[in-house]
Amino acid sequence: MIALKHLAHWDVEPARAARARYRSGDVEPTSGVAPGFTQANMIVLPRDWAFDFLLYAQRNPKACPVLDVSDPGSHLTELAKGADLRTDLPLYRIWRDGKLAEETPDATAAWAEHPDLVSFLIGCSFTFETPMVEAGIEIRHMTDKSNVPMYLTNQPCRPAGRLHGNMVVSMRPIPASRVADAATISGRFPAVHGAPVHVGAPEQIGIVDLAKPQFGDPVRIEPGEVPVFWACGVTPQAAVMASGVPFAITHAPGHMFITDILDSAYHA
């Protein structure tokens, strides 16, 4: 887990306002929402699976960088005082025996099924999109107001306990002349996936068709652009599926938890 640095007082109203909207039932992808505030993926597991996942994350830090872990039975996080992890994400997924059972904007009922749930908040690449935009690099899914495309690769994660699975990556088309800049900017945020894991040649990592992402929405790739791939916090959901985890709650891909922590806190 990454220790936060230079924490100070700042206006967290944009993050709180977004969470309040989601608590009231608004559903939307969170890319570009509350810019400047760190966003997080989430996976929630019964206590008897929590150590397996913590070890899985430790062994696969590029895809699963842990930002916070709750106490068993708690729906709170130190990353946003007063937030409720059961209601404050725009959309949740409920998993049973490794299969997606439902999507819901409120996970309170599912949460009540297990009194000892442990929540993990995982770094999200949306965090470094703001500095990329500020550097003049277009983020296509933000321009098109769609969800980021995410793909299941053929790259195995290192297993841990009962958990195994392949890495999931997110993709952003980047002009060939700006790929190095995108890698440099994102590389300054190792706690939220950091630099890309692959550039170009999607077939080399098992992606057959960029127009058919397993998660999220396809995006345009214009002439002169290169598909650039980052490790993605949906990787835990791939492990849930591959490992047949009996019960889990996760964020829906692209629908993150918005923290009160500034992006700059995770700048290396």
Swiss-Prot record:
Record organism: Allorhizobium ampelinum (strain ATCC BAA-846 / DSM 112012 / S4)
Entry's Gene Ontology molecular function annotations: lyase activity
Keywords in alphabetical order: Lyase
UniProt similarity note: Belongs to the D-glutamate cyclase family.
Descriptive protein name: Putative hydro-lyase Avi_5849
Coiled-coil regions, chain positions: none
EC code(s) of this entry: 4.2.1.-
Keyword hit for Lyase: yes
InterPro entries: D-Glu_cyclase (IPR009906), Putative_hydro-lyase (IPR038021), UPF0317 (IPR016938)
Enzyme class name: lyase
